[in-house]
Each structure stands twice: as structure tokens, then as C-alpha cells.
Amino acid sequence: FNQYTYEPITVILAKNLVGYQFSKGFEAKESIAELSSYEAGSKVIPYVVLGSVQGKDLLGFSYEQLLPYALPAENPEKAFVVIPGDFVTTEDGTGIVHTAPTFGADDAKVAADAGVPAMLVHDDRGNLVPLVDLQGRFRPEMGEFAGMYVKNEYYNEGEEPERSADVQIAIKLKDGDEVISAL
């Protein structure tokens, strides 16, 4: 169950991190039937491990875009797909990461090798541009985040919003049942 919305969810997680991710406030159960006694808001959330797969078996699977404000201008049908990356390990994290080919060298290389497009949109002159402008603000395509600086440090003193864009995005994802943990 999602710890924020209490709705049933299915999670894919590196096997050796199950104990870490589901340590505090969670309790392992043996069967799905044992989940029926869960009540929203309970201090202990039950979970069941349904099975396991190798990461390589997930390659090529597509997934839903978490913030569907814009699609890449080029080859959008090739976006949002599971691809391999030799820099992704369970020693340094979950073994599953979101790539941002527009903003990182490793991500750009692995995405290009797999044919995954960068998240670039056309500006009013037809140029391909990222969803964050050169001043560090979200572009108009970003809905309610349009015009906000990515980080509050970019605002003039006293002009920053109470909650930074990253915090507002995390809240939106939690409210939409899209997050199991926000670090």
C-alpha cells in the first residue's frame, strides 16, 4: 500500500533493497490474502513479495510518464522505455533509475545508444529546447510549474515560493499515488 495515499500499489525494486525500503513502518506477509486486514492510516503497512525478475527481463518495457506535460518533439514513441545502463547498480542505489538525457552525460549516452529521445520541445522559433530555460525556470509546457525556478536559490531574496519546485513536484507525485518514497 502507498504510505501516503493508502491505495494498493505494485512496486518493482532491487531484491537486496526490499528490507531497507520496507523496514520502518512495513511488515512482510506471506500471501495476498493477509493484506485484506489492512486499514488506511494504520501505523504498519503490510506487503507481499509476489516474485522476482532479472533487470534484463524488463528491457524494452514501456512505462507511463509521471508528469505528462510534454512529449519529446522527436520520436516521442521511443520515450519512456526501460533501457540498460552499466552505471546503474544496486550497490549505489535501487538498481532502477530515471534517466534525463537532456541533463546528464551518462544519461545522454545510454539514451542515445538505445534510441531514446531527449526531452526537448520546440520553442516559438522552432528550435529544440529543454523544459528548463537558460535562467533555470520551467518552460510554459510545464503546467502549474511554468515560470518557476527549478531551485529556490535562483530567486531574489524574499521572492521565493514557500515550497520550492522540487518539493511541489514531490507533493504532486505523492498525491497522485506515483511515489513510494521521497528522499
Predicted regions and their residues:
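Non-cofactor substrate-recognition interfaces
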Residues: 1-183
